[in-house]
Amino acid sequence: MTALKTTPFHQAHQDAGAKLVDFAGWELPIHYGSQIAEHEAVRTDAGMFDVSHMLVTDVAGANAKAFFRKLIANDVAKLAFVGKALYSALLNDNGGVIDDLIVYRTNEAETQYRIVSNGATREKDTAQFHKVGQEFGVAFNPRYDLGMLAVQGPKAIEKLLTVKPEWADVVHNLKPFQGADLGNDWFVARTGYTGEDGVEVILPGTEAVAFFKALQQAGVQPCGLGARDTLRMEAGMNLYGNDMDDDTSPLEAGMGWTVDLKDESRDFVGKAALLALKEKGVAVKQVGLLLEKGGILRAHMEVLTDKGQGETTSGVFSPSLKQSIAIARVPKDFDGDTAKVLMRGKEVDVRVLKLPFVRNGQKQFD
């Protein structure tokens, strides 16, 4: 068996009493004692997550902009200034999702960009970058030397700035989906995966443990993968491998907004397949499900509607709502507000809701 990879924060996790598990070949915390307390810290105060398993790749070259316009379904031409971020799907030729990622523009000349992509898809993402990059002559620099920490919650920025007061002007000026280079390989962006305000900090691996411990002292709760999953589920955010994959179109996974077809002259990987699917008609759509009574919704449960069957793609007990929730794909022409889920052979009633369930600590439905 191959040894699990560790992040630059590994010692800090051990010192904080983390229960470590195998996540896509990485040894990462599932929790530090109480997943529920960690979830609640992010919804009401401040929590932090080690996301160093995600891959930071710096891309440079005279044709870098043209490369990205080919590589991803969203259009980097929208990145109007340095530091602006774009969320996109990375598609295969069949229009399936290889990964979802964020691209930052990192210089004025539009010749340098930074990609942040998922840890579990690292190899196939990199293969796709190189495959598409060949004709554009761009250089890739995977930043294995860096760590990444998400600091999230209504008090996240306030507590972060007690540790890094010199960042105040920069951080206060960041709007959502903007990042800033702080020098010496420190980078901060107003992004996250929780449905709360906060930032993600990319930093030298050598400084990771000290930064983590300083934030702990400032009252930021270390949080594991368990809370990360319940938070992103409440926020209605997709998890790669559950809610979309190589065989799922972004149009079937609530990601249609990330596909930019405005510039008809732009050809991107997977475009022909997406247009063909649009022409034919997308058969399914993504919705949220809420279980009003006991039990837990899980992935791959059958959803029964008056327009046919669907399936849950992720399911969890929501600590904020105190009820079980799921993300599901159902027939496109189903527009009811109730359905049934097959749970241990029984049909159970669920409410059908528009995602997200929770945003900025507030429930998003009546």
From Swiss-Prot:
Catalysed reactions, as listed in the record:
N(6)-[(R)-S(8)-aminomethyldihydrolipoyl]-L-lysyl-[protein] + (6S)-5,6,7,8-tetrahydrofolate = N(6)-[(R)-dihydrolipoyl]-L-lysyl-[protein] + (6R)-5,10-methylene-5,6,7,8-tetrahydrofolate + NH4(+)
Which GO terms label this protein's molecular function in UniProt? aminomethyltransferase activity; transaminase activity
Highest taxon of the source? Bacteria
Q: Which terms are listed as keywords in the entry? A: Aminotransferase, Transferase
* GO cellular-component term (any): glycine cleavage complex
Q: What is an example of a Pfam family matching this protein?
A: GCV_T
Q: Where do the TM regions start and end?
A: none
- Family affiliation: Belongs to the GcvT family.
Q: Which HAMAP family match?
A: GcvT
Q: Which named protein is this? A: Aminomethyltransferase
